[in-house]
Structure formats: C-alpha cells, structure tokens
Amino acid sequence: MQQRTPPDKLIDPDGQVHRGRFTASVPRINGPEYDYRTPMGRPAPARQRRFHYKQFQYFGLVSDELLLGCALADTAWLGVAFFYWFEPATGALHEYSWRSPLARQPHLSQSPVNGVSRFRQKGVDIRMGYESRTDGLRKSLAVELPELQLQAYMDEPADFDPMSICTRTGINGWTYANKVAGLPVQGRLTRAGQTRQLDDLNAGGHHDFSAGYMRRRTFWNWACLSGHTDGHWLGLNVSCGVNETSFTENCFWRDNELIKVDLVDFDYDGDDLMRPWRIRSGDARVDLVFEPLNRHREKLNLVLFASNFHQIFGRFTGVLRDARGRETRVDGLHGFVEEQYAQW
C-alpha cells in the first residue's frame, strides 16, 4: 500500500478517522473525538465512548547483559503499569506491577512526538517522554523506585521511518500503532548504590504507542528484537491478531531503513510457552526461531475485565531478507515474544 502523509490529527473535524500507513508519526491521536457508533450505526452513548477506548505505551531495552520492559496502559476499567528487568547471565528476574481502578492512573500522552505519560503511586514514579528535536525525535523512560532509578532514552534520526499505521478494527473501531525498533539506547540504571551505563551495553530499544477503539475481546501474538549484529543495527516488529485489516504493521529495520513484511505465522506450543517458537512471514523475509529464557506474566479475571498476558524474553536465530533478497543473519540476538488475551 502507498504510504500517506500523516495528518496533524488522527480524527478529522467531522469525527472520521484517517486510516492507512503513514510516512511519519501522526502528531496527535485525538481518539475521543471520533464519531464512535454502535454496530447498528447509531451514535454510541457516552459510557461506551469512554470505556471502549484503549491506550497503551511500551518501552523495551535489549542487550546481552540486561533486558528490561515497561508498559503503561489505560483500559478505562483499569489502569496498569509494569516494569521488569532480567539478567540473562544469572537468570535473575525482578518484576513490579501496579493497578489503578477506573484508570485514575496513568495519565497518557495523546501524542507520540511531544508529551509525557506518567504513572505515579506511593513508592513509584514512571514517566515516558516524547520530545521533537531539530535532529529528530527522542523517546525516554524514567523509573523511580525506592531501590532503583532508571533514566533511558533512544533517538530517532530525522530520516528514520517508524511504523505508523491505522487500521479498521471490527465494524465500528480502529487501532493506531506507532512502532520503533533497532535504535541504540543510552542512559543509566542505578541499583543498590551501583550505576550501570546503558551506553556500554550496546543495547537496542523498542517502543510501542498504540490507541484506539479496539475489540472488546482481543488476542495477539507479537515479536520484537533489537540489537547490533554483523555490522548492522537491526530491529523487528511483527504481530498477528491486530492491525491486519487491509494492511499490517509487520516490518523490520536495518540501519534505520524500514523493510515491509507480509503476514506472519507464530508456531508455538500453547500449553508450554517456554518451548521454542517458529516465526515466519508469507513472503519469506522473516524466518526465525525463538528460544525462551524467562517471562513476565499478568493474569486477572474479573467480571468486566480480564487479561492473560505473557511477555517472554529470549534469543532469536535465523534470517531476515529485504526486497532484493539480501540476507542478514540473526545469531542469538535477544528480544521478546508475546501471547496476550484481553477482555476490556
């Protein structure tokens, strides 16, 4: 599909959503201004407009020595934040989760290019920042816990091509996703009086900014890697279950160049997610095996809200191919896969 120049706002003055794949990030995701309808075509009542709109943002870091992930989500029914870090050499996993009824926290930025998202409760302060600069865009993460402080950021050069896409979701909804991977991460992590410079880890970063009127019952698989190999910076973002109507978010980056990918199949054992996964695209541009090392889980089953979420971290091996058939070997790069079910 031909890319479109992004509008200033995702929802136009008539309440209609701009769909398609955009050449850059849409500056403002004004989702609540959408003319949301019932499946029968009538204007949706205010309660549905409020509780059917979902937002989540994620910042991940990947390296041989350290992996970490942080997410902020506003499901309207519940606000959620999680943060974890994992050391492959020792197998040590440190996890933190927080919840806020009726999503009183977090407060999420409506822009993937300028703004701050924040989750704050007693003993925790998390901020995700978005800052347009003369030389590109900076995305940052700051985490303040009693025993840990993190400051991290990744810079998108002005010529970087993010995956910026908005697709239909059911008869009356849509999903906007802004994805980035394969960029170096800088900053520092301080714990127990010891400071680790992220610059020294040769770490790669991933970021996800998603919002929309998503399906009431949603399932997806997702895979991401980010790192430096064979003289190239690589990033991968592929999924199934969301953003597949008319076009997809599937792609990988090599040295800041976005290479589009066809539909992707996730082949794995649903009874044992810690067994190897096979991830292949229909156009053969992605052919990877994922070996799990550990995982972060969130499970909640309430009357109106349910979540069964597995984010698994491990190593990818295989090959990525561009449109001209040039291969980049992937040999043990760290990354993530997900299995997610949500009733929200």
Where do the model's predicted regions map?
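Structured soluble/peripheral alpha/beta segments that form catalytic or ligand/cofactor-binding pockets
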Residues: M1-W344
